[in-house]
From Swiss-Prot:
Documented EC number(s): 1.8.4.12
Protein name: Peptide methionine sulfoxide reductase MsrB
UniProt enzyme class: oxidoreductase
Gene Ontology terms describing biological process: protein repair; response to oxidative stress
Alphabetical list of HAMAP family matching this protein: MsrB
Keywords: Oxidoreductase
Intrachain disulfide bonds: none
GO cellular component, as recorded: cytoplasm
Presence of keyword Lipoprotein: no
Family designation: Belongs to the MsrB Met sulfoxide reductase family.
Record-annotated MsrB domain positions: 3-126
Length: 142
């Protein structure tokens, strides 16, 4: 999608996060403390990224997930910004900056913590999956 169209479609924060590799403030974002059942999709493309089943309270200040809905929906990239080395997470289809993945997650779930900016996500409640075109993901919740 063209940058000008994206600027009109997204909030200023969502644009800064997804297109300019920004980071929203910790603990003051939409999904850090949000635990309803449903699907988290890329705010740019609508691509399904994470389910509420894999979300947990990590205490980091951003939504944290143990894994994406499918390994192919995200891509990882080495990030050497801010005088440290991390692994950036981007959406596969829209190439949106989502956040970072760390190896300090729950050991019983594979020890990964996908630390994702709320501004990069849109939440689709479980009871609206079919209506919004995400019916194929209902099976994840049974």
């Amino acid at each position: 999608m063209e940058k000008e169209k994206l600027k009109k479609k997204l909030s200023l924060l969502a644009y800064r996060v997804t297109q300019e590799n920004g980071t929203e403030a910790p603990f003051a974002n939409e999904f850090d403390d949000f635990f309803e059942q449903g699907l988290y999709v890329d705010v740019v493309s609508g691509e399904a990224l994470f389910t509420s089943l894999d979300k947990y309270q990590s205490g980091c200040g951003w939504p944290a997930f143990t894994q994406p809905i499918d390994k192919g929906v995200v891509k990882e990239k080495r990030d050497k910004s801010l005088f440290m080395e991390r692994t950036e997470v981007r959406s596969s289809n829209a190439d949106s900056h989502l956040g970072h993945v760390f190896t300090d997650g729950p050991l019983d779930k594979g020890d990964l913590r996908y630390c994702i900016n709320s501004a990069a996500l849109r939440f689709v409640p479980f009871d609206q999956l079919e209506a919004e075109g995400y019916g194929e993901y209902v099976k994840y919740f049974s």
